[in-house]
């Protein structure tokens, strides 16, 4: 945290916060004091957590005293607001913590009595006294209003307690909320209640220091300005403090500008940089702002120069080669696309061309072939052979038509036409697919171009997916609607992360706005919403996955199809990095998210469950052996239903050597809530996660239990015809959750990536092994046993298999090139 100099630094000596560290995951015991250290830990992913640290054996409803970062495997980090549980094996290093020790007491008439328990129904706003009303359904099923008041302030958290009820029936409802979640006027009023003498500069500066430690620098400057107005005689004493505040505020803004630029919001970042007055900032900070602006200008100039040079070279070649109409047509199309679409996100496609542009040993045709092939296939897949590359636009157009999608008969024709072109082999098609714009993109205009915008961000985009209904109801198609918001300055040439979110009892619109935020027309830029997902540059889709009247998650094929179909539709419509797809949900939307992601871990970079339980099938699949799934769970301390249902999976993942990487965040004293204050932390975590995928030269081991016919594929192994005696459908789920006659599918591949051990050897209708160059060497024979009777042969990549795989799975980043069908 920053600290003030001058008068402010001499007076801000506030009480050391008394931390408590404990499990507090049940109603059976209170928080437990511990001898834990206040430290910062850095996870292997790069995520940093701070707080008092201790270790425990397991998350449990039984009493356990944490060790002070001892030998136990589950590490607990208490920062006063939350307790975060991580696995010791996932920690890279630890260091000193910078958490603030400031704690201010606010007097309120608090209630005593036993701890209150119930289900949260509604939350009212805070008034000017720091009071709010929550409504809970108590153990007698009554709707009970409870008035709470703010009693403690810390730069990271505030504590609220139940106030005295004059009608009796007092209960202790103590909760911790994020300080950042308080409305600014409420926080200011509470801080000013700690001031006994408004003319006392020492007391007034304590408020400024609080804002600084809370990293609310604009509020700190506003508070200091008010102090200077109220105490003009002491104004000169604050000069050094004001300068330091301006520096901290400016550095904070610059960090935000750079972050926005890094997630693809260049226009917004430039507007922010141009709007701030740097005149009274120190020289280095001024230089940093100037450097950012100059880099932006230099990038634009580099793009304009690249356009001018390449277009000029193309035009000269066209004029001099009337005998090459195919090359002329290709270059004319290149001129149009480069002139219209060249930008920072695709400039690297021309890097091979730019690197050799002054090489006198290259002919004009070779150089233009480098530019053309780089533009369509990427700079790492270029060719100097213009006779081959001249057909690339034709090949790309056929691929786009195939995925449009074309009718079945036309797809057969396209495959035949592709055979004519040298650069239509699977290796070339894979490169084209990766660099292809979304094949079913909606008509948005180009958010990157002023005056060409049909989506402004004010209203969501609306779509629907259709899935086949259950046979019991005649297989009638069922439609599911979903809403989409795009991040500011969405650019189809950039690959974005996707957040697919599932509602609970709220509306699909409300679920979308939780992540995307509200529209801000005052910013004057296209597509600006103020939600955390927009800030981080995520595309957000909110799926109305439930049928009318549905009040619980049913673990059905219909629900899985709806969610996975929505994800694939998004991959077809928008420019999405398929290694950065996250499934999240609230309440029983979280229950759905856990089930779908844990059953299909190869589809997602991570799953985020908020105030929901890990239920039936995931509790059977928790020890499936595979490449791993990243799991982020958020619960309230008093949400015992979610905790008791999920603890088995959490403990196995945190404590054992299993394959899912898990983090559990528990909000102190809280019930079943939306936990919006956690969204920024969730997205910080998402930023660091990627989908796990087999890699060449690394051993792969998959061994997964199957209970439902639609849980039949993991990465590259797909099982067909799950025997009836091995199925446990949702309607037949045993009451005790036991007695399963499940079957496992497995595929093990050593480092040489030429042999696959595939099981079961006989049961079921067959197994398909899907192959890709990331983990298979197609120049060597592939052996498979015991399934398939000892298959050993070369496997040839196929255009049809590749394009059909992309048409069905919509994953243009990691398509399969070939397959082996085993009876």
Language-model features: where?
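A domain-start/cap signature at the N-terminus of enzymes
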Residues: 304-496, 805-807, 811
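Short beta-strand element of the alpha/beta-hydrolase
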Residues: 494-505
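Alpha/beta-hydrolase active-site loop
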Residues: 553-574
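Short beta-strand/loop motif that positions the catalytic acidic residue
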Residues: 633-635
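C-terminal catalytic histidine-bearing segment of alpha/beta-hydrolase fold enzymes
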Residues: 640, 644-754, 762
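C-terminal beta-sandwich/jelly-roll accessory domains of carbohydrate-active enzymes
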Residues: 708-751, 755-823
């Amino acid at each position: 945290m920053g600290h003030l100099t001058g008068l402010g630094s001499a007076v801000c000596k506030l009480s050391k916060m008394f931390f408590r560290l404990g499990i507090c995951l049940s109603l059976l015991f209170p928080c437990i004091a511990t001898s834990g250290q206040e430290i910062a830990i850095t996870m292997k992913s790069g995520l940093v957590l701070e707080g008092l640290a201790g270790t425990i054996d397991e998350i449990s409803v039984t009493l356990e005293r944490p060790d002070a970062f001892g030998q136990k495997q589950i590490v607990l980090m208490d920062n006063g607001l939350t307790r975060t549980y991580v696995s010791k094996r996932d920690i890279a290093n630890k260091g000193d913590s910078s958490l603030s020790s400031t704690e201010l007491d606010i007097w309120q008439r608090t209630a005593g009595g036993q701890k209150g328990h119930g289900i949260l129904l509604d939350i009212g706003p805070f008034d000017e006294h720091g009071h709010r009303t929550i409504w809970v359904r108590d153990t007698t099923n009554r709707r009970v209003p409870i008035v709470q008041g703010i009693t403690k302030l810390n730069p990271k958290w505030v504590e609220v307690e139940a106030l005295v009820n004059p009608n009796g029936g007092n209960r202790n409802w103590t909760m911790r909320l994020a300080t950042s979640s308080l409305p600014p006027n409420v926080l200011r009023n509470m801080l000013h209640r700690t001031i006994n003498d408004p003319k006392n500069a020492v007391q007034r500066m304590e408020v400024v220091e609080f804002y600084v430690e809370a990293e609310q620098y604009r509020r700190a400057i506003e508070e200091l300005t008010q102090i200077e107005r109220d105490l003009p005689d002491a104004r000169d004493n604050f000069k050094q403090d004001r300068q330091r505040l301006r520096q901290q505020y400016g550095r904070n803004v610059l960090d935000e500008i750079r972050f926005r630029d890094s997630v693809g919001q260049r226009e917004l970042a430039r507007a922010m940089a141009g709007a701030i007055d740097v005149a009274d900032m120190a020289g280095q900070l001024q230089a940093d702002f100037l450097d950012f602006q100059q880099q932006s200008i230099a990038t634009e100039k580099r793009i304009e120069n690249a356009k001018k040079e390449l277009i000029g070279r193309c035009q000269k070649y066209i004029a001099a080669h009337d005998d090459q109409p195919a090359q002329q047509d290709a270059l004319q199309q290149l001129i149009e696309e480069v002139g219209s679409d060249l930008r920072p996100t695709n400039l690297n496609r021309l890097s091979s061309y730019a690197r050799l542009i002054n090489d006198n040993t290259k002919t004009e045709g070779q150089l233009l072939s480098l530019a053309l092939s780089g533009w369509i296939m990427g700079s790492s897949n270029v060719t100097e052979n213009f006779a081959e590359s001249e057909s690339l636009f034709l090949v790309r157009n056929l691929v786009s038509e195939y995925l449009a999608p074309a009718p079945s008969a036309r797809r057969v024709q396209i495959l035949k036409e592709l055979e004519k072109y040298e650069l239509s082999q699977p290796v070339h098609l894979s490169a084209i697919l990766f660099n292809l714009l979304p094949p079913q993109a909606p008509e948005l205009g180009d958010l990157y171009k002023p005056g060409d915008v049909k989506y402004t961000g004010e209203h969501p985009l609306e779509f629907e997916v259709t899935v086949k209904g259950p046979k019991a109801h005649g297989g009638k198609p069922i439609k599911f609607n979903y809403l989409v918001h795009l991040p500011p300055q969405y650019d189809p040439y950039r690959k974005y992360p996707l957040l697919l979110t599932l509602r609970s009892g709220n509306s699909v619109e409300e679920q979308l706005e939780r992540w995307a935020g509200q529209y801000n027309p005052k910013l004057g830029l296209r597509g600006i919403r103020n939600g955390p997902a927009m800030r981080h540059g995520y595309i957000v889709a909110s799926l109305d996955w439930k049928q009318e009247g549905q009040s619980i998650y049913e673990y059905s094929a219909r629900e899985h199809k709806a969610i996975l179909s929505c994800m694939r539709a998004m991959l077809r419509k928008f420019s999405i990095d398929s290694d950065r797809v996250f499934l999240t949900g609230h309440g029983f939307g979280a229950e759905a998210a856990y089930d779908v992601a844990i059953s299909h871990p190869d589809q997602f970079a991570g799953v985020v469950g908020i105030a929901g339980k890990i239920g039936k099938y995931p509790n059977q699949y928790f020890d499936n052996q595979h490449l791993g799934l990243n799991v982020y769970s958020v619960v309230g301390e008093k949400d015992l239903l979610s905790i008791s249902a999920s603890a088995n999976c959490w403990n196995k993942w945190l404590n054992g050597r299993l394959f899912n990487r898990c983090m559990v965040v528990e909000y102190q004293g809280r019930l079943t809530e939306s936990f919006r204050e956690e969204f920024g932390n969730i997205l910080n975590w998402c930023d660091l996660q990627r989908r796990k995928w087999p890699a060449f030269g690394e051993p792969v081991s998959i061994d997964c239990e199957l209970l439902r016919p639609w849980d039949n594929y993991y990465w590259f192994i797909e099982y067909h015809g799950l025997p009836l005696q091995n199925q446990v459908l949702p309607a037949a789920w045993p009451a005790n959750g036991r007695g399963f006659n499940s079957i496992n599918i497995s595929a093990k591949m050593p480092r040489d990536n030429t042999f696959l051990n595939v099981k079961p050897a006989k049961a079921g209708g067959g197994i398909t092994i899907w192959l890709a160059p990331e983990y298979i060497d197609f120049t060597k024979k592939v052996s498979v046993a015991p399934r398939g009777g000892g298959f050993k042969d070369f496997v040839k990549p196929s255009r049809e298999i590749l394009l059909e795989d992309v048409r069905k799975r919509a994953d243009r980043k990691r398509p399969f090139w070939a397959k082996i069908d085993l009876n």
